[in-house]
């Protein structure tokens, strides 16, 4: 039985992970849960899964959780803060860590799991976007096992040779017969919306993804295709790929989650119903296969599968992310930080949908930054980019 710590248990990925645990109680045991401030949901999770430990992001939330659990007779030990999250990610008796805290806030605990040599199920893409080389160097040094959770990266992982799977981030694609990685994306809810209407898009409209059930931040990223741009950056690091070895293709049905093209002309694709429980179950049980609770794909109901080239006029954030990736780690760190601030401002109805790209571009092009050589330097770049993004938003609102 695998002992599991879930970082970000009350989020979308965290809940899907617990759903897989629920479907396979003989295979997985939850040892620790880590979340932000959603006390009531964390209390429900603790009562159902009886983890030994739980941690909230602040002491006020932790105190509220302790009171709720005490009323129910739970003996789960409750802690708070980043240090606690890092300690629970590195527990000696934990085999597997789901790294699903959204944003750069998830970086310290994800790194703690890596440094402890755990099997890390990576849903926190910001770890690679901001700390790609530093992160992969830690993976190699600690001999941790990295398994991607994003549906696209998990699909690529499943379609690659076992030799690359075992040496993720360091094997040569070319030497293993791989010609190119094909990253698919649905195009989001505004794939056919006239560009003239983009400035009037509301947060609720942006969060209404046609295929996937996701959190609000990642739903907006999908609408701008910034999510695909960040996945492009992540794929470059995860699979040791050059710019020439990755292409992005729009696939509105979200049935093929990504593909790998080989030198002999073959293309291997991973297909399935668009449900995050599938890649989560794959990574949790790897190299075995277990039930995810997802309904099987019915090809007769799916009908046609279509593909198109992304339009950068419609999706300028995608192009911005690809350009930032080619510029270096400082640029992708700044872009990620700016995007977190701009998306939050949009969700709070402080800016227009079209302002997201303007803010992101202004930050990336306006900051003169040297390449980071440590996590501390990455965090400095992150803070600078957030400050500049906030300043740009303030100017837009004046």
Curated annotation (Swiss-Prot):
It catalyses: 2-C-methyl-D-erythritol 4-phosphate + NADP(+) = 1-deoxy-D-xylulose 5-phosphate + NADPH + H(+). Mn(2+) binds at residues 150, 152, 231. InterPro entries: DXP_reductoisomerase, DXP_reductoisomerase_C, DXP_reductoisomerase_N, DXPR_C, DXPR_C_sf, NAD(P)-bd_dom_sf. Pathway: Isoprenoid biosynthesis; isopentenyl diphosphate biosynthesis via DXP pathway; isopentenyl diphosphate from 1-deoxy-D-xylulose 5-phosphate: step 1/6. Pfam families: DXP_redisom_C, DXP_reductoisom, DXPR_C. Its cofactor is Mg(2+); Mn(2+). The keyword Cell inner membrane does not apply. GO terms for molecular function: 1-deoxy-D-xylulose-5-phosphate reductoisomerase activity; manganese ion binding; NADPH binding. GO terms for biological process: isopentenyl diphosphate biosynthetic process, methylerythritol 4-phosphate pathway involved in terpenoid biosynthetic process. Belongs to the DXR family. This is 1-deoxy-D-xylulose 5-phosphate reductoisomerase. The gene is dxr.
